[in-house]
Amino acid sequence: MRKKRYLLGEIYKYCVNFDVQLIINNDYNLASLYEGSGVHIGKRDLPIKLIKSVIGTDRLIGFSCGGEIIDLNQLKENGISYYSIGAFAKSLTKTNAEELTQETIKKYCDNNDLPMCIIGGLDMSNIESAMKYRPNMIAICNGIFNQDKDRIKETIKKFQEIIDAKS
């Protein structure tokens, strides 16, 4: 745990330096330790009101919908800041995640009153397809880090160019 907190502290400093908000997955207690950081939760996590009582009401709280259709109005009423849907494609990070159907993605796009994040299996082969749905955010893991270390920076630049062109 000490190493985890040290590494997170270093990541937090990096985020502050580049004016990027740190979002911590599931661990709202950990998020409460870093000013301005947010937390991303799922259906099985504690009630949103309890999480807000720990981290504060001004923090971002994201919610994973997975592939289910969730009532976005209820999420908004409960104080969710954004939601994510996925997996967009086969994911190496969450191997048990089912791929979204186009119909499910379109339903979310049509009912989109909250910022939407597309997550899961995004890489150079499908990022343009994902961007056609005009998400507010995307989450990429293996599409960046599942390659030679010396190509990561170049890959991030390519993703950024595609995202900027489609935004």
Model-derived segments and spans:
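A near-ubiquitous, low-amplitude feature marking generic local secondary-structure context
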Residues: 14, 34, 58, 88-91, ...
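Short, charged N-terminal helix-start/capping segments
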Residues: 46-55, 76
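Alpha-helix-loop-beta-strand connector modules within alpha/beta enzyme cores
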Residues: 4-23, 51-66, 98-124, 158-167
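Glycine-rich phosphate-binding active-site loops on the catalytic face of alpha/beta enzymes
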Residues: 43-50, 84-96, 129-162
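Catalytic cores of alpha/beta
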Residues: 22-37, 67-81, 111-112, 116-118, ...
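Conserved alpha/beta-domain cores
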Residues: 2-12, 16-28, 32-34, 38, ...
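Generic signal for short, ordered secondary-structure residues
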Residues: 9-10, 30, 87-88, 109, ...
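Glycine/Thr-rich beta-alpha phosphate-binding loop at enzyme active sites
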Residues: 34-36, 41, 63-106, 110, ...
